[in-house]
């Protein structure tokens, strides 16, 4: 007796399970992980999306909730499991998992606890997707990108930290508000460590090729009557402000990560400020990851732009590198 499906559909080719071309995995289904997932789906970047987490009920619930929206996406397959076999064959793996900082906990202790989490996660990712590119989003992102690179054994062009892609987006938004011009037409770079010791490259800030520092030589200094330095201060403080107001940040970082993935999967060779291994650049001597303008394409992070930085900007970068190395050098089990 023929089934309804057999009566409805007349096959022309034999049914075979086709391997996905653009499979993306998100590790961790917290606020940030799910913002990454919805941003990836919204841009139709994946033909299969896999979610992984240790919290099985939440994981299943998030998967079902997304599957119920399948009519509104162009992603035919959404899967989830706590077993990493579900991630097999991923082109890109986004890592958002990690432990949160406890009150009064030192940064070193927080990082060490995350190292212990990553020691389980990273080998599993590489086991099932040996050719993937890993994007690390968990904080402190620059140190955890270094940890991922060490644990994965992958070449450095395939281990990327989300880094200052979001910091730069915040900077361009705030700049656009001040000038009344769309952020995409306001050009400026935040480099170095994601967060408190990031570096605003004032010498490169421009609109339509017009250097704003040439129009206002005091821009970014304490002597600036227009107080542009406040814009960078707001970039640093904005995450804390959002966390204070709603408990976490997620939408902007999710959109930022989807932006990076789009550049790679579509082989666009766009330039993004993301965290990469900077040893040997700008006089930095240790194996630390910091954000510099990097070219991303289908192979991963293929090149770094040699941006002309002023002496004080280089000094700030080196200071960031030293701060990170002070923590990294004491990490155990890497």
From Swiss-Prot:
The modification N6-acetyllysine is found at residues 7, 58, 119, 329. The modification Phosphotyrosine is found at residue 240. NAD(+) binds at residues 53-58, 100, 139. The lineage of its organism: Eukaryota, Metazoa, Chordata, Craniata, Vertebrata. The active site is at 194 (proton acceptor). Its main location: cytoplasm. The modification Phosphoserine is found at residue 44. It is an enzyme of class 1 (oxidoreductase). Interconverts simultaneously and stereospecifically pyruvate and lactate with concomitant interconversion of NADH and NAD(+). It catalyses: (S)-lactate + NAD(+) = pyruvate + NADH + H(+). This is L-lactate dehydrogenase B chain. The gene is LDHB. It is a peripheral membrane protein. Homotetramer. Interacts with PTEN upstream reading frame protein MP31; the interaction leads to inhibition of mitochondrial lactate dehydrogenase activity, preventing conversion of lactate to pyruvate in mitochondria. GO terms for cellular component: mitochondrial inner membrane; mitochondrion. One of its GO terms (biological process) is pyruvate metabolic process. CDD domains: LDH_1. It comes from the Eukaryota. SUPFAM superfamilies: LDH C-terminal domain-like, NAD(P)-binding Rossmann-fold domains. Substrate binds at residues 107, 139, 170, 249. It is found in: Cytoplasm; Mitochondrion inner membrane. Its EC number is 1.1.1.27. Gene3D superfamilies: Lactate dehydrogenase/glycoside hydrolase, family 4, C-terminal, NAD(P)-binding Rossmann-like Domain. Keywords: Acetylation, Cytoplasm, Membrane, Mitochondrion, Mitochondrion inner membrane, NAD, Oxidoreductase, Phosphoprotein. It holds the Pfam family Ldh_1_C. GO terms for molecular function: L-lactate dehydrogenase activity. Belongs to the LDH/MDH superfamily. LDH family. The modification N-acetylalanine is found at residue 2.
């Amino acid at each position: 007796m023929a089934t309804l499906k057999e009566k409805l559909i007349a096959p022309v080719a034999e049914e075979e399970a086709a391997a996905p071309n653009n499979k993306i995995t998100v590790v961790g289904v917290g606020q940030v992980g799910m913002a990454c997932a919805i941003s990836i789906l919204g841009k139709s970047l994946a033909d299969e999306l896999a979610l992984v987490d240790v919290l099985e009920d939440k994981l299943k619930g998030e998967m079902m909730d997304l599957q119920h929206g399948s009519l509104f996406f162009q992603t035919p397959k959404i899967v989830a499991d706590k077993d990493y076999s579900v991630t097999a064959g991923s082109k890109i793996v986004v890592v958002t998992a990690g432990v949160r900082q406890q009150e009064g906990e030192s940064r070193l202790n927080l990082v060490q606890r995350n190292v212990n989490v990553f020691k389980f996660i990273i080998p599993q990712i590489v086991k099932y997707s040996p050719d993937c590119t890993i994007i690390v989003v968990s904080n402190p992102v620059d140190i955890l990108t270094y940890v991922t690179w060490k644990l994965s054994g992958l070449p450095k062009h395939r281990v990327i930290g989300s880094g200052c892609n979001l910091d730069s987006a915040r900077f361009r938004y705030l700049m656009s508000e001040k000038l009344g011009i769309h952020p995409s037409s306001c050009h400026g770079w935040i480099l170095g460590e994601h967060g408190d010791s990031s570096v605003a490259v004032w010498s490169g800030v421009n609109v339509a090729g017009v250097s704003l520092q040439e129009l206002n030589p005091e821009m970014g200094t304490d002597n600036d009557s227009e107080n542009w330095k406040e814009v960078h201060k707001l970039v640093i403080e904005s995450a804390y402000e959002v966390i204070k107001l709603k408990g976490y940040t997620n939408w902007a970082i999710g959109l930022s990560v989807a932006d990076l993935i789009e550049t790679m999967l579509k082989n666009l060779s766009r330039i993004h400020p993301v965290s990469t291994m900077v040893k040997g650049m700008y006089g930095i001597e240790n194996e630390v990851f910091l954000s510099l303008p990097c070219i991303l394409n289908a192979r991963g992070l293929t090149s770094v732009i040699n941006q002309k930085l002023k002496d004080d900007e280089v000094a700030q970068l080196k200071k960031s590198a030293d701060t990170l190395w002070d923590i990294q050098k004491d990490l155990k089990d890497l």
